[in-house]
Amino acid sequence: MKKLIYSMIVIQFFFGISLLAQDKEISPDLSSVNNPDQWTLHNRRIIDGEAVHLNGQPGDGLLSINEMVFKNGTINVDIKGIDERGRSFVGIAFHILNDSTFDAIYFRPFNFKSPERKGHSVQYISHPNNTWYFLRENFPEKYENPVMPVPDPTDWFHATIVVNYPKVEVFVDNSEEPSLVVEQLSSRKEGKIGFWVGNNSEGWFKNLTIVSK
């Protein structure tokens, strides 16, 4: 009987450790983004400031965490873009293989309050093949949506991205209802995480936390 009780305690202990490890919240050190040993920057410059600020220039930009492999879990981040059409595509890339192969959720703040374009406010993409243009042409309104609630397009907003492969849910400003729910189009189930900005776009990021499961 004592041996059985001891075995149960040991099992509970190790399962408890496992669960704690799986649900551990990680807050990457954003003050170290200029350190190439910890972060990899592609096609952007980092502008000094209180938040991570990526400049705008032609082509997509990516700033990814080196020593982290993300599978499933929850990504929380504060994001800010600008209210200028075609110059504000800001979001999070995940399951990154390299700077051209990744999945991403991104926002178009200039569409947030536009009656005609609000349906294009949050977007899922899976590069290199499933670009926003390809998805809009072939699957209209399936991989992009309005956001609820509607943030100020020039202010900070909070994004929560829940990945449970292949399902991805996106929540804005702590809403209980998702603004977007999609199934991933890539077969990759893991990879790096990073800040992403689109063509000619600059973006600001802060308060990044990641809970892996």
Please place each PLM-identified region on the residue numbering:
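Positively charged n-region of N-terminal signal peptides that target proteins for export
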Residues: 1-4
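Bacterial N-terminal signal peptides
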Residues: 7-16
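Sec/Tat signal peptide C-region and signal peptidase I cleavage site
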Residues: 17-21
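Extracellular glycan-recognition regions
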Residues: 22-213
